């Protein structure tokens, strides 16, 4: 369950995503050679795996979990291996509108404090989603819990640094 096990395999990811850069970085750093295959979007990348044209699909856990939940045979797939990166998810606001930014930050902080954020996580990742009642099945990670406990404006580069 490590990236070294991808040696000689066909590894799918989605064109234009940070996963492409991440795969190449790990390939170079670890001396692991694999064949990259690209999907035009996440559904296409998953189809490469589902149809046997790829041996693995590297992407964000939430995207992988969603694709697995909606697969023809979800039990045929699982998320394995090490976390390859931690990347912040953010809300983009106009650069020169500090009042709006403050309002957005306050709304997020309130949602975390009053339990709405974890309730939304449960709704979209742990409970059946109508109309097909698909359950994504993605548990809340320690990294996400920590991010909610420590809301900030740190740039993505700060998350890549090992502490």
Segments predicted by a language model, with ranges:
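Extracytoplasmic/secreted envelope proteins and their assembly/folding machinery
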Residues: 3, 20-24, 42-46, 50, ...
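Extended ligand-binding regions for polar small-molecule ligands
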Residues: 10, 15-17, 65, 90-130
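Periplasmic-binding protein-like
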Residues: 61, 69-105, 127-151
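Short, low-complexity, Pro/Ser/Thr/Gly-rich segments in the mature regions of secreted, periplasmic
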Residues: 147-163
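Flexible hinge/capping segments at coil-to-helix
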Residues: 1-11
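Ligand-binding cleft/hinge of the Venus flytrap
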Residues: 19-38, 68-73
């Amino acid at each position: 369950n490590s990236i070294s096990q991808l040696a000689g395999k066909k590894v799918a990811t989605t064109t234009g995503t940070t996963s492409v850069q991440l795969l190449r970085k790990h390939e170079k750093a670890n001396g692991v050679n694999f064949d990259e295959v690209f999907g035009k979007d996440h559904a296409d990348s998953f189809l490469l795996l589902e149809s046997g044209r790829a041996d693995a699909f590297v992407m964000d856990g939430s995207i992988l979990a969603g694709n697995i939940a909606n697969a023809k045979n979800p039990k045929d797939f699982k998320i394995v291996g090490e976390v390859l990166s931690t990347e912040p998810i953010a809300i983009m606001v106009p650069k020169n509108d500090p009042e709006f930014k403050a309002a957005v930050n306050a709304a997020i902080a309130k949602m975390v404090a009053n339990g709405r954020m974890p309730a939304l996580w449960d709704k979209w990742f742990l409970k059946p989603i109508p109309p097909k009642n698909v359950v994504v099945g993605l548990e809340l990670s320690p990294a996400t819990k920590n991010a909610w406990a420590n809301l900030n404006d740190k740039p993505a580069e700060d998350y890549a640094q090992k502490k």
